[in-house]
Design a protein with these regions (language model features):
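Conserved acetyl-CoA pyrophosphate-binding loop and the N-cap/start of the following alpha-helix
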Residues: 69, 73-81
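Acetyl-CoA-dependent GNAT
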Residues: 4-67, 79
C-alpha cells in the first residue's frame, strides 16, 4: 500500500471524487488549490483532497473510496496519513460533512470532534437535493482535530 501526492491531471480522479461530493462545480472550487492524495493497494482505493483555509488550518474537502473497497479501512488509513502529513505545519484539521449517520461517526472514530454547523449549506450551494444514508442533507457539520505538537 502506498499513498501518492497527485500533482498533475487531478481531474482524472473526478469520477471517484464525485462519490463524496456529487456536484462537479463544488469540486472545481477546491480541486486545483488543494493537495490530492491517492491510496493505492495496488490499484486505486481512496482519494482525499486537503486545502489550506487559514494560517495553520487545513480542511479535508473530499474523501472517497471506491465502492468495492469501502468498509475495509482504506478511508481510516488515509485520514491517519493526512494527520501525520500535516502535523507540524497545521494546528487544526477540519472536515465538513453532511449531518449524516454514515460520515459523522466515521470521523469521530478517527478522532475528530464536532465543532460547529453551517445551516442550510446543502440547500444554498447545491442545485439538487443531496441524500446520504436515506437522509436529506441540509446543514454542513464541521468536525475538527487538533494537530499542534
Amino acid at each position: 500500500m502506498e499513498i501518492l501526492n497527485i500533482q498533475n491531471h487531478k481531474r482524472n480522479y473526478l469520477p471517484l471524487l464525485l462519490l463524496a461530493d456529487e456536484q462537479e462545480d463544488m469540486i472545481n472550487r477546491y480541486l486545483d488549490r488543494g493537495e490530492l492524495f491517492a491510496l493505492m493497494d495496488p490499484e486505486l482505493k481512496t482519494v482525499c483532497v486537503v486545502t489550506q483555509e487559514e494560517n495553520r488550518v487545513f480542511e479535508i474537502k473530499n474523501l472517497a473510496t471506491v465502492p468495492e473497497a469501502q468498509n475495509q479501512g482504506y478511508g481510516k488509513r488515509m485520514v491517519e496519513f493526512i494527520c501525520r502529513h500535516y502535523r507540524g505545519r497545521c494546528d487544526r484539521l477540519l472536515v465538513g460533512t453532511g449531518d449524516s449517520p454514515l460520515t459523522i461517526p466515521f470521523y469521530e472514530k478517527c478522532g475528530f470532534q464536532i465543532s460547529h454547523r453551517v445551516p442550510n449549506f446543502f440547500l444554498d450551494h447545491y442545485d439538487h437535493p443531496i441524500f446520504e444514508g436515506g437522509k436529506r442533507l441540509i446543514d454542513m457539520v464541521y468536525l475538527e482535530m487538533a494537530l499542534s505538537d
